[in-house]
From Swiss-Prot:
The lineage of its organism: Bacteria, Bacillati, Bacillota, Clostridia, Eubacteriales. SMART domains: G3P_acyltransf (SM01207). Catalyzes the transfer of an acyl group from acyl-phosphate (acyl-PO(4)) to glycerol-3-phosphate (G3P) to form lysophosphatidic acid (LPA). This enzyme utilizes acyl-phosphate as fatty acyl donor, but not acyl-CoA or acyl-ACP. The chain crosses the membrane at residues 8-28, 85-105, 122-142, 146-166, 173-190. The gene is plsY1. Pathway: Lipid metabolism; phospholipid metabolism. Pfam families: G3P_acyltransf. This is Glycerol-3-phosphate acyltransferase 1. Probably interacts with PlsX.
Amino acid sequence: MKLASKEAGMIDLFMILGAYLLGGMSTGYYLVKLWRQEDVRNQGSGATGATNAGRVLGKKGFLLTLMGDALKGALAPALSMHFNLSLTTLILCLIAGVAGHIWPLQLGLRGGKGVAPALGGILVVDPMLASAAAGVFLFVLALTRQFTLSGLAAILGAPILSLIMARPFEQSAGLAVLAIFILLAHRKNIREMLNKSSQRRR
């Protein structure tokens, strides 16, 4: 039996809002609070993601944060698929989860960079595309040995791969929005990489 349009719209809105709030549950922030009684945002880069958590907690903290952030990015899209919601709602849940990770309300809009939850969500939405994006990540990592640059390459490549693989417009557009969000979150890193590159040429 089909839900009435208004009721279906409320469910969609609830799922999208829930995805944002879930995204704001920053794994690295809570792990560092638990293990060190410190605010990870006052350490290193100031981000709550896996790379910065790893600076404070070591390899174990990095891996736990990476897995936690990827899982939370996957959860809302997985629930959307379970309840057979529309592709548009599914993609909006993916975007909202990543937005919550980058700009968490409960942490004063100071979160992570968004790569791990984005890749976790993409894995649920389109496993084949996620595999191709992972290939881009590994290729760039092998060339540069830079985790941040490799993650950016994978995320920027995702909407292009989606178009090449003739995926629905909503998916390709949503992945482009994700890429913009993640670029914004990495703007400081990008400036630093450009400055280093410029200094090497001198």
